[in-house]
Amino acid sequence: MSHQILLVEDSRTQALRIQLELARYGLKLLIASDGNSGLEATRTHRPDVVVLDVDLPDLDGYAVCRAIKSDPTIEHIPIIMLTQRDAAHDTITGLQVGAVDYIPKDSLAEENLVEALRQLGVL
């Protein structure tokens, strides 16, 4: 069974990099480019995991995470935050709002994302 991942990312370049990496593992990737469409896609498609950027053009990733975790129909879906923000307080905020992991976008971002997905049993 192929797992479905929802990526909420406004950078086309970053989304393509992640898409290419996850395709190597046979994962189905849905992409939303802003917070509102990411929230709607989560409710509509019920992905196995949401990979969520923090800095989005409308709702930020923290607000999207809070909305998912406050909706009893989708609160069970794990959320991994993948973001440029790498300060300790950002990581703490991400985990406090319900993310299961918080990954900075650096040279190891895709590799760390794959490892996080392994830990969740998606790979």
Residue ranges of predicted features:
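Active-site beta3 strand of CheY-like receiver
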Residues: H45-V51, L56
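The feature encodes the CheY-like receiver
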Residues: P57, R66, E75, A87
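Charged docking surfaces used in two-component/phosphorelay signaling
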Residues: L16-R24
